[in-house]
Amino acid sequence: CIRDRSNVLSAEGREMLAKDFPEIRTIASNYFTGEFAYVQEFEVAKDGIVEQPRIISGAIIDDYMKMAALSELNMHFVNSHFIHPDDLLDEDRGAALGWEKMKSNLAEYMDWLVDSAPSLRQLTGSELSGAIQRYGAVTFTKTVTEQSIELKLKNFYDEAYFMVRINEGTPGEVSGGKLTHLTGNLYLLQAKEPTVTIEKLED
């Protein structure tokens, strides 16, 4: 994985990385637009490099960072955070607060994250890269009847995750996967097999 400290990467530089450094499989930069920043989506690029943006960074957890984190939990159910090693030395990025306060900010944020989204998987950068590859490759067809919801997956490797909203009925037994309730009628589905069937119970 490569991450440029300034998040600046030109189109020419991006092309060179893929061509001259085939051992680089992942680039981590910005999810939100910034001046001169290399902006990414969670995806696999045409050249095969995994685009792995970070959502927030640092130890100054301000309102913008909270909004960004919450928005991405709602969008992809993902949180990615990066802290610069030299944040401890840069007053604009938290050094003026002191290490104890910076550490406390991060601890409070992680406590909030675990309490708010306990179903999030805790992955390393390399593991997240693999998850993005699976997410980008898998497709599905859905069949809904009065008795069940069936998903048939293509390009399935070993597991896949979906956000599932069940508007009618209550989910019962699940074959080929695991269903975790998130909120209201929204569920997190872990597909463990290429075919997943969710039984529908009457309300």
Residues covered by each model-derived region:
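Catalytic grooves of carbohydrate-active enzymes
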Residues: R3, N7-R14, D20, R54-A131
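Extracellular glycoside hydrolase catalytic/binding regions
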Residues: I27-Y31, G48-I61
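C-terminal beta-strand-rich structural cap/linker in extracellular carbohydrate-active enzymes
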Residues: L182-D203
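Catalytic domains of cell-wall/extracellular-matrix polysaccharide-remodeling enzymes
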Residues: I2-K46
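Short, surface-exposed amphipathic charged segments that create phosphate/polyanion-binding patches used
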Residues: Q40-K46, A68, A137-T143
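Surface beta-strand/loop "capping" patches
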Residues: G125-N167
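A generic structural motif
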Residues: R25-V39, R121-E127, H181-N185
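Solvent-exposed beta-hairpin/edge-strand motifs
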Residues: M163-K178
